[in-house]
Swiss-Prot record:
GO BP of this protein: poly(A)+ mRNA export from nucleus; protein transport
Function comment: Regulator of protein export for NES-containing proteins. Also plays a role in mRNA nuclear export.
Quaternary state and interactors: Associates with NXF1, NXF2, NXF3 and NXF5.
Coiled-coil intervals: none
Cited InterPro entries: NTF2, NTF2-like_dom_sf, NTF2_dom, Nuclear_transport_factor_2_euk
Identification of the protein by name: NTF2-related export protein 2
Chief subcellular location: nucleus
Gene3D superfamilies per UniProt: 3.10.450.50
Annotated source species: Rattus norvegicus
Compartment annotation: Nucleus; Cytoplasm
Keyword field: Cytoplasm, mRNA transport, Nucleus, Protein transport, Transport
GO cellular component, one term: nucleus
Highest rank taxon of the organism: Eukaryota
The NTF2 domain, residue ranges: 17-136
Length: 142
């Protein structure tokens, strides 16, 4: 019974972290993009439609070149990642999908997956992005 209670606690923690993170991430992306890299680990990796960006400086340069955006999240899912798979680092998988409109471009469907890791300090826990994978989901015209 204790294992079921422990797992439920991890799932609840993952859900709270994911909801808070998604609100912060997309609001920051749309309104304060210059601050977005603060949500990433120093050696985080972003894969944006197949293009790999690694490290805070490269991420800052990449986000700076994107046109302004309006994200609408239609779906959010999350789950804790077993600590044996992450060298006992508390980690959450967050999956989102929705629509985004970048200035000067048509609206696109997208999905985005994040691996968040808990960074603990004596007073709090902050979730940071270790890995981020973004992909447009538009169907090709036939």
């Amino acid at each position: 019974m204790a294992m079921a209670v422990d797992f439920k606690m991890y799932v609840d923690q993952a859900c709270r972290a994911a909801e808070e993170f998604v609100n912060i991430y997309y609001e920051t992306m749309d309104k304060r993009r210059h601050a977005l890299v603060r949500l990433y680990l120093d050696k985080a990796t972003l894969i944006w439609n197949g293009n790999v960006v690694t490290g805070l400086e490269a991420l800052a340069n990449f986000f700076e070149m994107l046109p302004s955006s309006e994200f609408q999240i239609n779906m959010l899912d999350c789950q804790p990642v077993h600590e044996q798979a992450t060298q006992y680092q508390t980690t959450v998988l967050v999956v989102t999908s929705g629509v985004v409109k970048f200035d000067g471009n048509k609206q696109h469907f997208f999905n985005q997956n994040f691996l968040l890791t808990a960074q603990s300090t004596p007073n709090s826990t902050v979730w940071k992005i270790a890995s981020d994978c973004f992909r447009f989901q538009d169907w090709a015209s036939i």
